[in-house]
Amino acid sequence: LITVFVAALVTAGMAGATAVPLASLVSEHATGLVYAKAGPGGPTRSEADAARWIRDNSKPGDLVATNAHCMIQRGKTCDSRHFWIAALSERPVLVEGWSYTNKANRDSITTGVNPSLLPFWDTQRLATNDAAFTSPSAAVVESLHRYGVRWLFADNRAGEISPNLKQYFRLRYATLDATIYEFR
């Protein structure tokens, strides 16, 4: 009987120790964050279809760039636990969410800041990546090419998408929420 009681006590303690920190990660009151757009943190059906289209029409090592990085955003603070494009496309992404990276977790230990709320450490890469979607130019396209990007996943819910993308990339697939482009 004592063994059962101790086991139950340990289990309850472990559950509580896990739940309390997790609550601070997701509580918008604890972080002051709000959802960037109304809706779930995951993809819409059409976004998921677009990611699967990339999976079905590309090679496993093809690199994807996307403008979607934050599950939740307020001002310059980004909850960077966004990873479903890489997950559903089964392709590497130049910059998507970075919360689950070794670098973010190491930086979290040294700074005491939640890894989900740390800014992306390679500001030049992020700026180049995002410029491809907001203000594409020959220089930006060349930079993406040097990184090895083959595909663009333009998520309409993540922000404005420049109509000039079609000058540099070939439109391959479009849904209500996402458009897929390929390097020409």
Model-derived features: where do they sit?
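Extracytoplasmic
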Residues: 2-184
